[in-house]
Regions:
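Short N-terminal or domain-adjacent regulatory/targeting segments
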Residues: 1-17
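Conserved beta-strand elements of the Class I
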Residues: 22-23
Length: 139
């Protein structure tokens, strides 16, 4: 089943109704978007799984080194890495059966990788901030 790009608020609302978010590039540094946005999501009831090979602890837990290492079931992969790393992250996501949505934060996009994910039946949201969309659609 070919998934189409996510464009409607109804689709975004449905995605924001999912529970578990693996955050690739999650930061241990307060003040950085890659820390503050996942923190906001955690505070709003999501299970946030930090992925960062260089940090010892984020949000009171040890982060995974990569998406491939995550033992929990993942609904959404939220990407806080440069656009040129998106393709590899999408490859990792497509190796997993559990990932329903790949979401790249503001300023991050790779259309070719997005098309591959959609061809595999995954939903893709590019170049949007999950916190902004949550505030706008869920409150």
């Amino acid at each position: 089943v070919l998934a189409m790009p996510v464009e409607s608020d109804a689709e975004l609302r449905e995605i924001l109704g999912l529970e578990t978010i693996a955050v690739v590039g999650c930061s241990a540094t307060p003040g950085k978007d890659a820390h503050e946005i996942p923190k906001y999501l955690k505070e709003h009831g999501y299970e946030v799984i930090p992925i960062n090979p260089f940090a010892d602890e984020i949000f009171g837990r040890e982060p995974y080194d990569s998406l491939a290492d995550v033992e929990e079931a993942v609904d959404i992969v939220d990407v806080f890495r440069p656009s040129d790393e998106v393709a590899g992250i999408v490859d990792d996501a497509l190796e997993r059966d559990d990932v329903k949505v790949i979401w790249t934060q503001l300023g991050i996009a790779d259309d070719e990788a997005a098309e591959r994910a959609e061809a595999d039946g995954r939903q893709v949201v590019q170049d949007k901030c999950m916190k902004v969309e949550h505030q706008r659609l869920v409150g």
